[in-house]
Every structure is written in C-alpha cells, then in structure tokens.
C-alpha cells in the first residue's frame, strides 16, 4: 500500500482532530470470546460470507439465518447451522436464535430497501409477521430511514434475549485507513474536489439521506438516496460525461455499527471506472472494503485513487 506517509499530509488539518482516526460510528462491544455461538443474520453480497469465514477462523460456532432471496449460495457451508427466514418475519429471527442458545448476533448484507419499502406488491411478496407489523407502527410509520429500521429490528431481537453486536469487529483489517491507500495518486483537482464535497456529505449523512456524493470541479453531481451507491454511481456517470470525477462515501455521525456500515468492493471500483470516476474518498475507520487487497489492486489497475478521510469533525 503506497503513499500513506507522504499523502496523509495532504489531508486538511480540520480532518485531523485527535479522535479523527477512530471514526464516527457508535462503538459497541466486540463479540464474546470463542467458542461462544454467534448468530449471523445474512442478506446478500460477499460481506456475510467474509464475516462467517472470520468468525469460523476465530473458533466461533455460527448459526446463520439467511434472508429469503438474498443470501449467497456458499454461506450455508461456512456455518454450523443454516436456516432461511422471511425478510419481514423479524419476530421469528430472535426466537429461532434464542431457542438454540444464541445471545449475540451480527446482521450484515444487502437487502433491496427500495423494493422492500415501495414495491406495490411488497405485502404479497414479503408477508410480515405480527412483530414486523408492530415494529412498523412503533418505529417506521413516520420514519423509514435506515437508523429507524435498525432500531426496530434490534428492539425485537432484544425481546428474545438476542443482542446485535458490532458487525465490523470480526473484520477490522478490512476498514479504510487514513491517507492514500492506492499506488495511484489523486490529482490536485480531485484533492480539491473531495475537500470541497466532504462537509456537504457530512450534512447529507446527518439527515440520513444517503452515504455518498459525487463531485467534479467543486460541483456536486449526484447525491445517494434510497437507490444505493451502485445505481448512484451509474447516474453520476450519465450526468457527467467528463472523466475524473470523485465519489465521497462515509458514515452518518453517530452511526450504529450494528448494521448498514458503508461498504465498497471490487464491483464498486469497476462501476466507478465504467462511469468515468477517477477518485474514491472513504471515511477512514468507517467504511468496509470487502477483500481490501483485491479492491486496491483493481483500483490501481483501472487508474482510480482511493483516499481515506478521517471524519471526526463537524
């Protein structure tokens, strides 16, 4: 990993408070020591797979609940037990885990929130149980943002004696670090762009609108909302035909590490390249880089610089 020592000096001093490198996510206790059983509530993508491998290597017993239509095929083989559960059957999640002696769980992976919340046939495709209906009226009827959804799920699991824990603890070596992480260096224009855009991203995240903005020549091209980062990248590329724009991605101040931690992977880099981006600025300590070495290699190969920005500032 090249350039961190020299290029970290290019990060503005306002980004470098004493607590800067600790990130802004809510810090939760680490998983209990092995062989304590851990529940894994898994959506889609490779993150649940990587966490399962890490937990298994650490010596934990893994009891996995795969969300219907979301989980990856290789996941059952990495877990001691596996069961598919309905996406909106949240009342059953805690009961199933508690029944087999699980008191701690990690919830990770992708779920298409747009389809889940706004599909006209959502109640037919994903029939909710009574716990989900109750959670809707307590938490989500007036606020459907990610933190409200997490609170509803955590509360329901807690009723069954299952506590959600820090989803990044098993993979802390996969988090973004301060400074330039790639051999490929950002241009002066790209540095100016992420310095310009970062305070705006912080405001977007405080409102829990999204976790990313796209910027070029000190002008915001796109803001992420419910569509997710991949679709937002595609939209930014369509709006900005000029090459070399920058994507800034971070975590909401006070964000809860129990779920929805900002995540990028090799596909993110490939999507950025296809859309004409030239730089990716990530919140250091707050963004997961799935298979980090592969991500950095892909970025260098495709000419995209990746910079970690400490985020403990307002």
Identify the function of each model-found stretch:
Residues 11, 48-74, 79-81, 132-136, ...:
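N-terminal positively charged helical leader segments and presequences
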Residues 90-170:
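N-terminal glycine-rich phosphate/adenylate-binding segment common to multiple enzyme folds
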Residues 68-92, 98-102, 124-128, 132, ...:
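Feature captures the catalytic cores and cofactor-binding loops of soluble hydro-lyases/lyases
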Residues 55, 143, 167-269:
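Conserved mixed alpha/beta catalytic, RNA-binding, or beta-rich assembly cores of soluble enzyme
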Residues 26-67, 88:
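N-terminal basic/disordered segments at the start of proteins
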Residues 28-34, 56, 75, 98-100, ...:
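Solvent-exposed alpha-helices and their adjacent loops that cap or buttress functional pockets
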Residues 37-39, 60-65, 103-106, 154, ...:
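Structural motif
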């Amino acid at each position: 990993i090249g350039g961190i020592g020299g290029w970290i000096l290019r990060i503005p001093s306002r980004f470098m408070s004493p607590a800067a490198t600790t990130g802004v996510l809510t810090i939760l206790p680490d998983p209990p020591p092995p062989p304590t059983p851990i529940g894994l509530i898994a959506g889609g993508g490779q993150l649940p797979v990587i966490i399962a491998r890490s937990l298994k290597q650490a010596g934990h017993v893994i009891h996995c609940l795969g969300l219907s239509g979301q989980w990856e095929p290789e996941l059952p083989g990495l877990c001691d037990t596996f069961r598919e559960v309905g996406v909106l059957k949240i009342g059953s999640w805690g009961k199933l885990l508690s029944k087999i002696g699980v008191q701690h769980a990690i919830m990770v992976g992708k779920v298409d929130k747009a389809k889940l919340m706004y599909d006209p046939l959502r109640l037919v495709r994903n029939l909710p149980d009574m716990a989900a209906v109750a959670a809707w009226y307590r938490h989500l009827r007036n606020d459907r943002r990610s933190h409200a959804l997490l609170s509803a799920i955590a509360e329901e699991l807690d009723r069954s004696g299952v506590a959600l824990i820090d989803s990044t603890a098993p993979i802390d070596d996969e988090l973004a670090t301060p400074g330039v992480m790639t051999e490929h260096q950002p241009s002066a224009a790209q540095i100016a762009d992420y310095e310009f855009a970062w305070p705006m991203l912080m405001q977007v995240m405080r409102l829990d609108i999204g976790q990313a903005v796209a910027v070029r020549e000190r002008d915001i091209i796109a803001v992420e909302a419910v569509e997710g980062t991949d679709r937002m990248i595609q939209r930014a590329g369509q709006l900005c035909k000029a090459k070399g724009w920058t994507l800034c991605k971070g975590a909401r101040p006070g964000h809860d590490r129990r779920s929805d931690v900002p995540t990028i992977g090799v596909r993110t880099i490939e999507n950025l390249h296809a859309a004409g981006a030239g730089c990716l600025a990530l919140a250091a300590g707050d963004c997961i880089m799935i298979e980090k070495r592969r991500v950095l290699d892909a970025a260098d190969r495709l000419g995209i610089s990746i910079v970690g920005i400490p985020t403990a500032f307002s």
